[in-house]
């Protein structure tokens, strides 16, 4: 498994991103009193959600288009389809040939990427600010009409299939725990299927299915456009209307039922990995619903348990007992606690020495976790967690040429119809009390709400051959 910070950039990422040659202002550390992100939000008649957040600190602009279709609700019997379609979006559009979108952005001094996540697929560019119109024209061009043919589909099926072989089937800890935990912890198919994709499903995708998928989900009324950086608001609005205004809305099907029943008993899964050099253990707890008081409390519990060398799990497992040298995990292993919109897990995983029993590792983890369920947390620990989360949150806003902030604004527009809630987050976390931490931990950190995966290496003489 990649460390969480690296996975965010690498998972489902296109390999052509070039180095970012400029910076964005950092929002990290302790922001000044009254810190405020400028947000203007409106919708076009065709339903496109538009978020504008000007910042003239650096002469760059970040443009992101988020479609409300991730791998969570991809078609049954077509696992991996959302990811496959992400690749198809770079195979040409009405006025741009195959891979010309990439060349256009890079030739204008920019970077670009696309990714598939639980609840959205996104595409973004960071460009010099005088190239804003270029980015908007290009994104609208492929929203208007995708150039899809049998040759492109077969080519990308091969590319995605190879990714599955390299990243999952033939890699140590290939799907552990970022694929394995959701599949084991959840019972609803939408949350529990193999989202990276089964090779058989990927190879079975038909051209007509790709066209239908595009016509259904890649529509303005199923998307959010966010622009962050150095731009004139009035001019940006004109560009948005000019290029996205004519795009026709589609009849988007309602979201399926994603709910999970309350888990009552602990689940334990045993897994063998012939390529793993060491055993590993992962735990995952079902999260509260988004935007509830308990949700914000879990954000702080994540800081207490997992984030940094002062985290409770690291101190107990690494510093005190010497069972591991690192603890990975967090809320939403493929993003963060803000950019998803369905059932989610707070997860942690460790790799440990073969001489140690898995039960002993789990007991050590419980030794760090259980005190949060037994009495109100120490005020000093809670305050430190609030500072850590605040610093991390504002640092993320300045990442990748404004991508971090753009990601939050687009997610809040897409899922909550309220991107301005970015300015209310700090207050929500500040309202969390020791009593709320205790209440939340009692319900959500109980063993009955937990799934445990025990991964053991296979003996070398019984290892299975890698898939070709």
Positions of predicted regions on the chain:
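Bacterial N-terminal signal peptides
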Residues: 10-21
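Non-catalytic, conformational "gating/processing" segments within enzyme and secreted inhibitor domains
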Residues: 150, 157, 166, 174, ...
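M16 family metallopeptidases and their MPP-like homologs
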Residues: 51-53, 58-76, 80-84, 98-143, ...
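N- or domain-start disorder-to-order transition segments that initiate the globular core
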Residues: 32-58
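N-terminal secretory signal peptides that target proteins for export/translocation
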Residues: 1-7
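An aromatic/glycine/proline-enriched structural segment found at the starts
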Residues: 187, 220, 224-289, 447, ...
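Boundary at the C-terminal end of the N-terminal hydrophobic targeting segment
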Residues: 21-23, 28
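Active-site His/Glu-centered metal-binding helix of metallohydrolases
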Residues: 81-89, 301
